[in-house]
Amino acid sequence: ASEKQRKPPFWRYDLAQNNLLMSSHHMSESNLPFYYEKLKSFKPKEIFGYPSSIYRLARYIVESDKDRYIPNVVITTAETLLPYQRKVIEEAFLCSVVDQYGCTEMAFFASQCRYGVMHFHPEHSIIEIVDANSNPLPNGEPGEVVATSLINKVMPLIRYRVGDRLSLVDRALKCHSYFPVIG
């Protein structure tokens, strides 16, 4: 990396949306203090990003016994949020962590409710779980995700094979949501 990339800032502002965009690429043990100080001074209401990057900063905060900045929520996306990561992130930021699941093509979107259950959002897309021959599978059986986007007006995706495998389940939920549940 060039000398310029080894020193702050490792972020840029999106003034139109009042966002601070921090580089995951430049996160290193020696740079974490800069990230911490910038986050603390910016005081975001929400922290949104890769679980691995947020976890790395959270671990630094916990292990260094830093003062806590408490956002309203931490939202993770684009990677699997592992239980040990969630625990450290919650400990560092003293707030709930909401995980999201989707794809760049905007073919589908899912998120966790406050009870930790991952729901697809039917206003966003139509989801099917199919076998290798594109036949629909009943709830509880794992198969390939096929999605029809209801929001991408630029490039409509109809029965788009996402490449992910999962199952949907029928479940009585505390949250009383009727949205499909990922099993």
Functional labels for PLM-detected ranges:
Residues 14-183:
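Active-site glycine/GP-rich loop and adjacent strand/helix microenvironment
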Residues 1-2:
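Hydrophobic alpha-helical hairpins/lids featuring a short glycine-rich hinge
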Residues 6-13:
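Short, flexible, mixed-charge acidic loops at enzyme active sites
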